[in-house]
């Protein structure tokens, strides 16, 4: 596999094959793509699955129609929604990578692009500011976290979502704050 920002030319492919002692058909290009979900299609176009199956003496019949449908809906959504992701560690989006990927998949399944609005709970300190913070969101996700820092903001967020009838999901401490707010 040759990672590259650009298409690997035939001459480069042949040179790599020569020095790696493999047939040039076994030099697979892993060029940059816009989405990680395109990578299996790029490899399938180069028959990587078939090469591996042949080498391992397996029967190979790729089933990529669902991936192609997924990619089409991913690239051409019919709708857009904005979800407020509220938590303590919003300056580190990778802390919530699994949640972000879940939104990608849920969005694709519903023909929608999910835009994220990051909100630090320490910024929510009173009812006056909260209206402007959530004025442009279609839903609120209160993220997990530990400790008391930002708890007041979380409880105010739960109250706002309930009173304004904004779709809401609290995970872990987020759900606990929703129960506290309601009780």
Question: What kind of region is each of these model predictions?
Answer:
Residues 1-182:
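N-terminal beta1-alpha1 cap of cysteine-dependent amidohydrolase-like domains
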């Amino acid at each position: 596999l040759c990672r590259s920002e650009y298409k690997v030319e035939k001459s480069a492919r042949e040179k790599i094959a020569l020095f790696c002692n493999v047939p040039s058909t076994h030099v697979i290009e892993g060029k940059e793509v816009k989405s990680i979900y395109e990578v299996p299609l790029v490899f399938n176009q180069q028959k990587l699955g078939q090469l591996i199956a042949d080498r391992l003496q397996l029967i190979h019949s790729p089933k990529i129609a669902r991936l192609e449908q997924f990619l089409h809906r991913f690239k051409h959504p019919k709708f857009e929604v904005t979800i407020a992701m509220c938590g303590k560690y919003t300056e580190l989006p990778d802390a919530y990578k699994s949640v972000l990927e879940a939104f990608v998949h849920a969005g694709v399944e519903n023909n929608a692009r999910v835009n994220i609005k990051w909100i630090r709970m320490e910024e929510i300190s009173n009812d006056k500011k909260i209206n402007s913070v959530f004025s442009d969101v279609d839903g609120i996700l209160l993220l997990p976290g530990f400790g008391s820092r930002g708890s007041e903001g979380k409880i105010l967020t739960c109250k706002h979502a309930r009173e304004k009838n904004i779709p809401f999901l609290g995970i872990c401490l987020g759900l606990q704050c929703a129960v506290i707010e309601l009780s």
